[in-house]
């Protein structure tokens, strides 16, 4: 794994999960079910957890929703899922926590938006109630500031001061600074109200990639709180994936960011779990964490007019993801497995040798055979109509042989403890 220098932060414990610079970057997601439907919400949390989400946020926006949070927690516990639940509060959080104390106890973390808690003294009182409730229940809090719901009184105060200055800044720069000030001032208030520093996580979300990078660089330089990364709205499909990757990878490479969420707009028919998979793939391709064996495959060219290698690459990746629910327990360390599926002789043998297991399928005009390489050595040559089945059997046998109870992996002729990989 990559040993990037992380920005030093407090360590925030959220049930069995630690968020901070001494822990791996944590992936979280959010449900889109009606929280008042406890059964549907619990089932979606299960799906997100199965996909690899380590914390899940749920909307708590009404008495009906708040009254079901404890039931959702019970349903998850009954299914054997200890996934921490984050309550997303806006506008009326203090009232819901007061009327439904079991809701506050069942949640593992509260998300509070300073921009819509309320105005003036009344807003301060609401904020104070939520913070004190979190402290009494020993819960963590994410103070999450959003570009679209910034505290307008703070924004106006800072805009007025900027206009009165001898060298006024562009309004958008003042707005970015207001986001940061809102988060930091709210955290300071929370500490004064009795919430320990190691119970606070901050976020300042915007929708533009360059703005997010600028804001988080500045925020990270001015506090020691763990930071939650994500665009407010990344968008749909490839645009959302690219925008999230572009923003988060820059910050993560600089050691900024302790928990992430990929806010994709779901396409019709696409699974909610896609945002979890994208988050995992960002961290894994950067070498920051390993979640599932990865498949390296060539993009194809005129030498690979057959679609066989493309189909095999897809089949192998799907097979590995499906097996991980079992392998993760039986074969610790298997998530670091690297499999290559290549389409012709140009790069096929070389890439296959560099992978733990690789197969080089024949390109156009090449001999219809597919050599398989294991730990850099040519092991067998496959041919015929059952190449996919035979190759997956080799992968299965490799996993059983090299990972498991002894906690060791044979790699390039050496035996290496899994924890050192």
Curated annotation (Swiss-Prot):
Quote the InterPro entries the UniProt record gives: Dihydropteroate_synth-like_sf, IspG_bac, IspG_bac-typ, NO2/SO3_Rdtase_4Fe4S_sf
Record GO biological process: isopentenyl diphosphate biosynthetic process, methylerythritol 4-phosphate pathway; terpenoid biosynthetic process
Which amino acid positions bind [4Fe-4S] cluster, per UniProt?
298, 301, 344, 351
Q: Does the keyword Cytoplasm apply?
A: no
> Which cysteines bridge via disulfide bonds?
none
The UniProt keywords, alphabetically, are: 4Fe-4S, Iron, Iron-sulfur, Isoprene biosynthesis, Metal-binding, Oxidoreductase
Task: Copy the pathway line from the protein's UniProt record.
Answer: Isoprenoid biosynthesis; isopentenyl diphosphate biosynthesis via DXP pathway; isopentenyl diphosphate from 1-deoxy-D-xylulose 5-phosphate: step 5/6
Q: What GO MF terms are annotated?
A: 4 iron, 4 sulfur cluster binding; 4-hydroxy-3-methylbut-2-en-1-yl diphosphate synthase activity (ferredoxin); 4-hydroxy-3-methylbut-2-enyl-diphosphate synthase activity (flavodoxin); iron ion binding
EC top class, in one word? oxidoreductase
**Cofactor or coenzyme needed:** [4Fe-4S] cluster
EC assignment: 1.17.7.3
Q: According to its UniProt record, what is one Pfam family this protein matches?
A: GcpE
Keyword Metal-binding on this protein? yes
Cofactor details (free text): Binds 1 [4Fe-4S] cluster.
Please give the catalytic activity noted in the UniProt record.
Answer: (2E)-4-hydroxy-3-methylbut-2-enyl diphosphate + oxidized [flavodoxin] + H2O + 2 H(+) = 2-C-methyl-D-erythritol 2,4-cyclic diphosphate + reduced [flavodoxin]
The entry's family comment says: Belongs to the IspG family.
- Role according to the record: Converts 2C-methyl-D-erythritol 2,4-cyclodiphosphate (ME-2,4cPP) into 1-hydroxy-2-methyl-2-(E)-butenyl 4-diphosphate.
Name of the protein? 4-hydroxy-3-methylbut-2-en-1-yl diphosphate synthase (flavodoxin)
Q: Which organism is it from?
A: Neisseria meningitidis serogroup B (strain ATCC BAA-335 / MC58)
- What taxonomic lineage is listed for the species of origin? Bacteria, Pseudomonadati, Pseudomonadota, Betaproteobacteria, Neisseriales
- Gene encoding this polypeptide? ispG
């Amino acid at each position: 794994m990559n040993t990037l220098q992380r920005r030093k932060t407090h360590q925030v414990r959220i049930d069995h999960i630690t968020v901070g610079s001494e822990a791996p970057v944590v992936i979280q997601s959010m449900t889109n079910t009606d929280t008042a439907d406890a059964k549907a919400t619990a089932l979606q949390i299960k799906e997100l957890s199965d996909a690899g989400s380590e914390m899940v946020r749920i909307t708590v926006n009404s008495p009906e929703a708040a009254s079901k949070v404890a039931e959702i927690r019970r349903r998850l516990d009954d299914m054997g899922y200890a996934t921490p639940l984050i309550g997303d509060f806006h506008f009326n959080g203090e009232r819901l926590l007061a009327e439904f104390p079991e809701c506050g106890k069942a949640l593992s973390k509260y998300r509070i938006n300073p921009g819509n808690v309320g105005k003036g003294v009344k807003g301060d009182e609401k904020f104070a109630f939520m913070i004190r409730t979190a402290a009494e229940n020993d819960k963590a809090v994410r103070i999450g500031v959003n570009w679209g719901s910034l505290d307008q009184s703070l924004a106006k105060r800072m805009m007025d001061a900027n206009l009165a200055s001898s060298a006024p800044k562009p309004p958008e720069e003042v707005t970015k600074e207001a986001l940061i000030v809102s988060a930091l001032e709210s955290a300071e208030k929370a500490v004064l109200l009795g919430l320990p520093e190691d119970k606070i996580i901050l976020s300042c979300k915007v929708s533009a990639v360059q703005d997010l990078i600028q804001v988080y660089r500045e925020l990270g330089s001015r506090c020691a709180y763990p930071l939650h990364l994500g665009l407010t709205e990344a968008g749909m499909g490839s645009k959302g994936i690219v925008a999230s990757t572009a923003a988060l990878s820059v910050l993560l490479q600089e050691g900024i960011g302790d928990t992430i969420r990929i806010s994709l707009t779901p396409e019709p028919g696409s699974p909610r779990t896609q945002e979890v998979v994208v988050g995992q793939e960002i961290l894994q391709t950067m070498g920051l964490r390993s979640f599932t064996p990865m498949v390296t495959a060539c993009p194809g060219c005129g030498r690979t007019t057959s679609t066989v290698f493309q189909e095999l690459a897809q089949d192998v990746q799907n097979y590995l993801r499906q097996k991980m629910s079992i392998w993760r327990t039986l074969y610790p360390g298997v998530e670091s497995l690297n499999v290559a599926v290549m389409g012709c002789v140009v790069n096929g043998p070389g890439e296959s040798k560099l992978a733990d297991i690789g197969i080089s399928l024949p390109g156009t005009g090449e001999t219809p055979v597919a050599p398989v390489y294991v730990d850099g050595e040519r092991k067998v040559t496959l041919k015929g109509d059952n190449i996919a089945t035979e190759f997956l059997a080799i992968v299965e046998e490799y996993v059983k042989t090299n990972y498991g109870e002894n906690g060791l992996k044979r790699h390039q002729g050496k035996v290496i403890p899994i924890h050192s990989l």
